[in-house]
Amino acid sequence: MKKVDVKESAVGRETRIRKQWNEQSIFEQSIQNREGAQSFVFYEGPPTANGLPHVGHALGRTIKDVVARYKTMAGYKVLRKAGWDTHGLPVELGVEKQLGISGKHEIEEYGIEPFIKKCKESVFTYEKQWREFTESIGYWVDMDDPYVTLENPYIESVWHILGTIHEKGLLYKGHRVSPYCPSCQTSLSSHEVAQGYKTVKDLSATVKFKVKDSENEYFLGWTTTPWTLPANVALAVHPNMEYVKAKQEGHVYIVAKERVQDVLKENYEVLSVHKGEELLNISYTAPFPMKEVTNGYRVIGADFVTADSGTGLVHIAPAYGEDDYRVVQSEGLSFLHVVDEKGEYTEAVPFLKGKFVKDCDVDIVRYLAKEGLLYHKEKYEHSYPHCWRCDSPLLYYAGESWLIRTTAIKDTFLQNNDSVTWYPDHMKHGRFGKFLENMVDWNISRNRYWGTPLNVWECESCDHQFAPKSIDDLRKHSTKETQEDLELHKPYVDEVQVCCEKCGGTMTRTPEVIDVWFDSGSMPFAQYHYPFENKELFEEQFPADVIAEGIDQTRGWFYSLLAVSALYTGKVPYKRVLSLGHVLDEEGQKMSKSKGNALDPVDLVNQFGADALRWALLVDSAPWNAKRFSERTVLEAKSKFVDTLVNVYSFYVLYANLDEYNPNETYDVKRTKLDEWVLSRLHSTTKKVRIALDDYQFTNAAREIAALVDEVSNWYVRRSRNRFWESGMNAEKAAAYETLHDVLVTISKLIAPFTPFVAEDIHLNLTGSSVHLEDYPVVNESLLQPKLEAEMNAVLQVVELGRSNRNQHSLKVKQPLAELVLLEHNENDMDWESYRDIVMDELNVKAFHVELDETKYTSYQLKLNFKTAGPKFGKNVNAVNGWLKQLSQDEVQNFVSTERAVYEVASGEEIVVTTEDVLVEKVAKSGFSNTTNGQYTVMLDTNVTEELLQEGVAREFIRAVQEYRKQLNLPVNLRVDVILDTEEELQQTLTNHKELLEENLLVKQFTFGHLTNEDDELSLGETKVRIKLSATK
């Protein structure tokens, strides 16, 4: 075995391992070795390569890698195809910035074709960084053969899917109000909108709409979007709701009866009550009368009106509200548009023409006030949608769009979702399920340039539509011969014209591109160019057994995958969804570069290693929980887990090499109870880890492994050191080597999916083979000893209590004590005699015994809890307090046992005192200190005799010399002669414990003599010792 370089950095070790993987094609071998095995399918959600990875990507890649590695080691064939999401607005915006242009007008001036070429060039700007990040974090995914959404085969599959949807009559062109980004100048789908809500404070206004032909009567309407008022065409009331006419300061106001107090506040008089239906068709004067409104400015009925907020009357602007649009359509009222595609007012609002509408709320309110039409204004905090790409506030804007009739197959969506297992479970019928319940038709078109062209050609003569499902299909219907290598992007496909089958007219392509979420939602099919090729491979790889991405994909990729599959095949595309929580900073705030609190995962890997980063992301909390994260989190993972394991591994290699131990040879072995215990712990942990991983409970599995590694290091190895230090090779020493070898090899397999680099380093050195080509460990039931584990757990509890006791009373473990008494509070069949030597050695005591009668060593003190007793006992509280203080120890013991006592006051009244009224404190017998955990109480004799004190000094000297040997980098098996120069009292103490010193320090000869200032000096408290070591001849 190669010597372990404990000074090698984590990133140095991981770089070395990566090189070995690449040279030996270990990733490829891990898949090839499972050829013919059952497939386990997972899909890679495609990232965009025109932005850099963040810590959230590290979590996602870690989880996906853990699943894929575990399932591979569990016997499955796991294909891992990478993917790139290459279309969409982010790419366009990046190119605009690069070119120094902005907006559609400037893009078209620059030229569509050169702009598209620039987009194509820019999409892989950071591919190298993504590849390096992916490899450095240990995520095994095939990046040499990825699916890429901009490539013709991928687009052709998307066309086949959308063409099929059109064929089913589910794709239609409609005029409707959609969420619209004025900055990007395109509409968005409902699931995109759901990703970008922000809490904002907007100016709200309660507006006076004067009843026509009245002197002082007004409808009051409340709006949080004053900018929409110039487009008002109606007011809506609920026909079945009650409204009042109320007089205030000479004006009569009409509001909902339930809202009158909140709106008018005070000094008003209700004149009459009316049903909403009585108000229908009453005309009013609009705040911004428009001549285009030939049918409007009257009250209409709508069932979406409520009295939950506002005035109970809704101002209707059909161009900027979905409900508004529907009700105006049904009423046959006029339609009014006063805002252009840039979100700026048109000449219809002359005094605000050219201004961005969201910046004009104050101007509108000032105008209303000037005209005497403002009743009230205030800032209103509410949730408002923003563009998930550019962060601009959205408008609801009427226009033509291509939509998919998802509502027509809503039941299929819901049924498919019911068959999916969600992690966490509440997502299924909560956030995701509710989104499906409230779905609207999918706005699939985008008025942009860089994307999959929407494959619908429309006839200029008869409005017939043609939706080709393949390139060949398009070629067959083209009016001219198309080039062989036709690129399926604008402007190239726009040049293809089709002959109308219906009337013989010319058909041109509708100019829009497809929503990028449709691109990524098509990946189960398009990644294999289905249905044009790879049908068998597709069928093998559909549906996914699991997908895993961030929670923000609930209304993104998780939805688009489900939607595309339901629309295309009717089937569910995945069996399980792992919805990962946000990675926050240590204050619980979302990380962002603008805030300066973002952590770069590449920097974390370089500083602490990928294993530490992965472990930190897994062990802290379940991955679906939002987690606070910092450099300190990763440092702790490195020091507490990775470094601890490396130290155990290094210890084993060091001594096995010294003793020339060969695990492939046969030795006479005699396993101790400690060996049997650690093997039982190893296999019971394996059992728990497999159960956890099969249920995707990564954190539970990681914590089980962490506990095992800690016990192996801080209990098994520490308790076994003397066996390794012995000279020669006896049966117990051989058993220690064999056991630790088996433990380390099995642990390397257990951790391989979690921390693949250190796992590989250990396994490769101990066995000569890659751990990632091994099977995952299975439980050896014959090695399980639950009773032994329970007993050793009890020993560990007692030892921990003993250490805590020493710490609380400033008694160093090196200082021997006379006695430990263990008080057991519950009788059991624990054989403490078998563990006597372990407890005595661990806690450095000369005697140990178990006592069931705790009254021999402890007593109780009762103190009145005035916080609860004061109100309960009132004037008798002081009397009760005095009575408690004079109770005998037997009476106190009886109270503790029964948890109640009765005190009779002078008047003869009986007062019942319970444990709620009293603070019970356990007090140790004089000369003893106690620590308890409820099940056990450890009593330590704290009287330190002179003899014990001297032995404590000798043990401190041993510790100091051992540290000194480390500083000198002396081989651990080197025997030395020691010369000491110190005061006479210490000389005597060390002489008296010569045998103890020689046994623990590999010293052949101790002598005392005069040393010079050139020799080294050790400190034992305030005492100085000069020391000189020389190798034994």
Swiss-Prot record:
Main EC class the enzyme belongs to: ligase
CDD domains: Anticodon_Ia_Ile_ABEc, IleRS_core
Motif 'HIGH' region, chain ranges: 47-57
Biological-process GO terms, alphabetical: isoleucyl-tRNA aminoacylation
Record's GO cellular component terms: cytoplasm
Principal location listed in the UniProt entry: cytoplasm
Keywords carried by this UniProt record: Aminoacyl-tRNA synthetase, ATP-binding, Cytoplasm, Ligase, Metal-binding, Nucleotide-binding, Protein biosynthesis, Zinc
GO molecular function: aminoacyl-tRNA deacylase activity; ATP binding; isoleucine-tRNA ligase activity; tRNA binding; zinc ion binding
InterPro entries membership: aa-tRNA-synth_I_CS (IPR001412), aa-tRNA-synth_Ia (IPR002300), Anticodon_Ile_ABEc (IPR033709), Ile-tRNA-ligase (IPR002301), Ile-tRNA-ligase_type2 (IPR023586), M/V/L/I-tRNA-synth_anticd-bd (IPR013155), Rossmann-like_a/b/a_fold (IPR014729), tRNAsynth_Ia_anticodon-bd (IPR009080)
Cofactors: Zn(2+)
Residues noted as binding ATP in the record, renumbered to the chain: K593
Signal peptide: none
Iron-sulfur listed as a keyword: no
Reactions mediated catalytically: tRNA(Ile) + L-isoleucine + ATP = L-isoleucyl-tRNA(Ile) + AMP + diphosphate
Protein's cellular compartments: Cytoplasm
Residue positions of motif 'KMSKS' region: 590-594
EC number in record: 6.1.1.5
Entry-linked Pfam families: Anticodon_1, DUF5915, tRNA-synt_1
Subunit structure: Monomer.
Family note: Belongs to the class-I aminoacyl-tRNA synthetase family. IleS type 2 subfamily.
Primary role: Catalyzes the attachment of isoleucine to tRNA(Ile). As IleRS can inadvertently accommodate and process structurally similar amino acids such as valine, to avoid such errors it has two additional distinct tRNA(Ile)-dependent editing activities. One activity is designated as 'pretransfer' editing and involves the hydrolysis of activated Val-AMP. The other activity is designated 'posttransfer' editing and involves deacylation of mischarged Val-tRNA(Ile).
Domain notes for this protein: IleRS has two distinct active sites: one for aminoacylation and one for editing. The misactivated valine is translocated from the active site to the editing site, which sterically excludes the correctly activated isoleucine. The single editing site contains two valyl binding pockets, one specific for each substrate (Val-AMP or Val-tRNA(Ile)).
Protein name: Isoleucine--tRNA ligase 2
Organism of origin: Bacillus cereus (strain ZK / E33L)
Phylogenetic placement of the source organism: Bacteria, Bacillati, Bacillota, Bacilli, Bacillales
